[in-house]
UniProtKB/Swiss-Prot annotation:
GO terms for cellular component: bacterial nucleoid. Keywords: DNA damage, DNA recombination, DNA repair. This is DNA repair protein RecO. Involved in DNA repair and RecF pathway recombination. InterPro entries: ARFGAP/RecO, DNA_rep/recomb_RecO_N, NA-bd_OB-fold, RecO, RecO_C. GO terms for biological process: DNA recombination; double-strand break repair. HAMAP family: RecO. Belongs to the RecO family. Gene3D superfamilies: Nucleic acid-binding proteins, Recombination protein O, C-terminal domain, Recombination protein O, zinc-binding domain.
Length: 249
């Protein structure tokens, strides 16, 4: 199969040295999904590709691709970089984890659909200074569908009731209303935490405004999401361990 020279727009979210002077990098792209590219000579100080392979560089990348395996980064046309991410440990930790999580939800060259914008909006919101914990929880909850384990959050799993007091049941695969609290095992969340999880899972991230959520409530919903992931996805990501160290949890 002949290789095509193609322009893709997206974000470089991961890189590692390959051999002596080359780099392997992962791109989150609108056109092709997740793509691993090799930047030949990218480690050399005078490399023309050096600027394009810095972590969290957004732009238009020209790649030589066969739509499988490793593509080759040839050049770039427009780049946007965020130098503050190199010194802001919190932002860096959150973003590294979110893209690592998304990287495990999709195969390479799999179309991302609306998840492309989900991660890009999350990236830009965190860079702009919005609460990274709330944004991370939105992404975590909405990526569950990409993993094939989307919970039912719009209504009670058992009776379909949409309003009232709810709790989350991992065994039932979603929320249960107070009428059925004794019917299934549940997480015993506060009503506010369950309401927050339902809201974050169903809210388009582009509609997220400036909101103030108490630290205790965020920690409760964070623990619940961690339990959901452990029971349904069961990933053990070093990036999550690092994030937990940074945020002290």
């Amino acid at each position: 199969m002949a290789a095509d020279l193609l322009d893709v727009h997206g974000l470089l979210f991961k890189r590692q040295q390959y051999k002596e002077a080359d780099l392997l990098a992962k791109l989150w792209t609108k056109e092709l999904g997740i793509v691993t590219v090799i930047a030949k000579g990218g480690m050399r100080p005078k490399s023309q590709l050096a600027a394009a392979v810095l972590p969290f560089t957004e732009g238009t990348f020209s790649i030589l691709t066969r739509y499988k395996g490793i593509s080759q980064l040839r050049t770039y046309k427009k780049l946007s970089q965020h130098d503050e991410l190199f010194t802001d440990l919190d932002k860096n930790a959150y973003l590294s984890y979110l893209f690592d999580l998304a990287d495990h939800a999709f195969s390479e060259y799999q179309k991302l659909g609306g998840y492309y914008d989900l991660l890009l909006v999350a990236f830009n919101r965190i860079v702009a200074g919005q609460d990274p914990e709330i944004i991370a929880q939105i992404v975590q909850l909405q990526l569950l569908d990409a993993f094939g384990v989307a919970p039912q959050l719009g209504a009670c799993v058992i009776c379909g009731k949409e309003k009232g007091i709810f709790d989350y049941s991992i065994a039932a695969g979603g929320v249960v209303c107070s009428d059925h609290f004794r019917s299934v095992s549940r997480l015993h969340l506060s009503p506010k935490a369950t309401a927050l999880i339902r809201t974050l899972a169903l809210l388009p991230i582009s509609r997220l405004g400036e909101i103030q959520i108490g630290e205790d409530l965020k920690k409760e919903s964070r623990r619940a999401i961690a339990q959901i992931y452990q029971a349904t996805v069961d990933l053990h990501l070093p990036s999550l361990r690092f994030l937990n160290e940074v945020r002290g949890s």
